[in-house]
């Protein structure tokens, strides 16, 4: 007969918390367990925290596009515009599972930045000074930006293949940094865990989501 091993029941204490970072203390934990537990938690946070990103674009009036297509009157090609859009910080409230469509409609000469993006009421651009492209002379542009919610790094081939839309490889992860250190005592340990996001999601929610994910995977009876 195998007897149940005595164990601690840890408690989480929030030490610091602001709009894009959180530091918590988790303890008490068994000796030599904190490092393994922290690494698992770190992997879950990086891989399974969802974020919002631009996955592709469409130039209205042009039916066939590819990554190296030139945009009439625009200094950058499609690939360069998409690369600039990868740095867009998008915050969404009350996601209704409808397609995320943003638009840019401008006439040149003009330097287009993220503040020029027209968004639905439930979407906010946090970095509104991000450079996107330059319109030359009297050219006009009418872009539709396609966004999506996802986790981790996703290749463009996942989103499909349409002649009128160019998709790009996308990193949905809103996590900038995760670190930890262990306080060791005679009979137990404490784990100090730190998370920093890009500002598009609440770090407290990130922590709760990671523990919920972990609970779903290990709460197995047999």
From Swiss-Prot:
It is found in: Mitochondrion. Gene3D superfamilies: DNA-directed RNA polymerase, insert domain (2.170.120.12), RNA polymerase, RBP11-like subunit (3.30.1360.10). InterPro entries: DNA-dir_RNA_pol_insert (IPR011262), DNA-dir_RNA_pol_RpoA/D/Rpb3 (IPR011263), RBP11-like (IPR036603), RNApol_insert_sf (IPR036643). It catalyses: RNA(n) + a ribonucleoside 5'-triphosphate = RNA(n+1) + diphosphate. It is an enzyme of class 2 (transferase). GO terms for biological process: DNA-templated transcription. It comes from the Eukaryota. One of its GO terms (molecular function) is protein dimerization activity. Coiled coil: none annotated. Its EC number is 2.7.7.6. One of its GO terms (cellular component) is plastid. Disulfide bonds: none annotated. Keywords: DNA-directed RNA polymerase, Mitochondrion, Nucleotidyltransferase, Transcription, Transferase. The keyword Ribonucleoprotein does not apply. DNA-dependent RNA polymerase catalyzes the transcription of DNA into RNA using the four ribonucleoside triphosphates as substrates. Belongs to the RNA polymerase alpha chain family. This is DNA-directed RNA polymerase subunit alpha, mitochondrial. The gene is rpoA.
């Amino acid at each position: 007969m195998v007897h149940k091993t005595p164990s601690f029941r840890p408690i989480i204490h929030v030490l610091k918390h602001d709009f894009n970072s959180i530091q918590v203390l988790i303890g008490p934990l068994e000796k030599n367990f904190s490092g393994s537990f922290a690494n698992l938690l770190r992997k879950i946070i990086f891989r399974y925290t969802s974020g919002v990103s631009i996955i592709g674009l469409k130039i209205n009036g042009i039916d066939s596009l590819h990554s190296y297509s030139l945009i009439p009157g625009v200094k950058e090609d499609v690939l360069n515009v998409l690369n600039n859009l990868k740095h867009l910080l998008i915050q969404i409230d009350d996601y209704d599972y409808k397609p995320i469509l943003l638009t840019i409609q401008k006439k040149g000469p003009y330097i287009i930045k993220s503040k020029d993006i027209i968004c639905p009421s439930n979407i906010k651009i946090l970095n509104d000074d991000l450079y996107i492209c330059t319109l030359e002379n009297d050219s006009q542009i009418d872009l539709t930006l396609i966004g999506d919610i996802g986790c981790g790094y996703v290749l463009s081939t996942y989103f499909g293949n349409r002649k009128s839309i160019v998709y790009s490889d996308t990193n949905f992860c809103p996590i900038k940094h995760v670190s930890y250190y262990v306080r060791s005592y005679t009979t137990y340990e404490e784990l100090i865990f730190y998370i920093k996001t890009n500002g598009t999601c609440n770090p407290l929610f990130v922590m709760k989501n990671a523990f919920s994910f972990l609970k779903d995977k290990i709460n197995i009876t047999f």
